[in-house]
Amino acid sequence: MIKNNTADLISFLEKSVSPYHTTAEAIRLMDESGFTALEQNKPWKLEKGGNYYVKCFGTMLIAFHVGCEYVPGEDFRLAACHVDWPCYYIKPNPEQVSGGCAKLSIEPYGGMIHNTWLDRPLSAAGMITLKSDNVLAPERRLVDFEKPILTIPNLAIHMNRSVNKGVELNPNKDMLPICKSVEQDFNKDGYFVSKLAELAGVAPEQILSYDLCIYNAEKPMLCGFDEDFLTSPRLDNITSAFAVLYGIVNCNRAHGVTAAVLFDNEEVGSGTKQGADSATLGLMLEKIACALGASRSEYIDSLASGFMLSCDVAHAKHPNHAELSDASCNAVMNKGTALKMNYEQRYATEAVGIGMIEGICAKYSIPYQRF
């Protein structure tokens, strides 16, 4: 069972090359599992025992199950996570030429460890908008180059003798990916959009804008003599997305409403309309309650009696730097789920919530660690 879950997780990681693609893969899973799609801005008709999902603003998803014995005012139980990760986004008009190479201007997104991106095969994926008959509703299309088209070359040690003493990398200089060897007569203007149009099968002038992240094109894999480690890009936080999605697919709770929620933009503060620090989730939960015949007061009752898991990864105790972990509350790889708690309220936990989760873990013999 664990091996099967690992194989499914690896497949999910491979397909999650941008937040848009993660959400699309989640929708594919919901469709295969018999969930009904809802429109964010259309009326809903919900039934007891039904499974549904709604996509919000491209990269946020709420998938939920209505209990077959649902009564208005019963609790919401949610498991939420984020689908973005630290990476680079490609700027508009990105083309530059230097040293016989075409390269692209990028912007860092989230908390980066820049040097981990050097000398790797990189690709790009995301969403483009195209001209349509309605200027207020451009066509949206997901794109993925699906092969290494970029690399960020490191500086050879012969040109940087102090590299092993620590080097500060400037994203606007040191981290620009190269994409093509060029001659002196190369016309850089519009080159990237032309390649993007070729990929999408449209004319370059049809492309209005794009939202494209660079991703590590290396495949996830198991490593270690016993294959007890998984090395992969995007573990933070596609692993949690995988967990909550498979949780909702297997949910059959008879009462209340149970939901899996995928948010975007956690790495930059969650303040967008598709982020956790927006009104979107509350509005969608209220819409669920209304469609099930609940009053405003009963909706508030559902919130007050509800519970939400905030699912994210935790830092394991580093084998080479154990001194950097907390002396008594730390997580060790492969020793169980980490229950994260912080008295400055950095995490969405307190004694009651932790107690509930510990009770669940004890009831079902789930190993866990305090973090």
Please give the residue ranges for each predicted region:
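N-terminal hydrophobic/helix-forming segments and targeting peptides
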Residues: 1-371
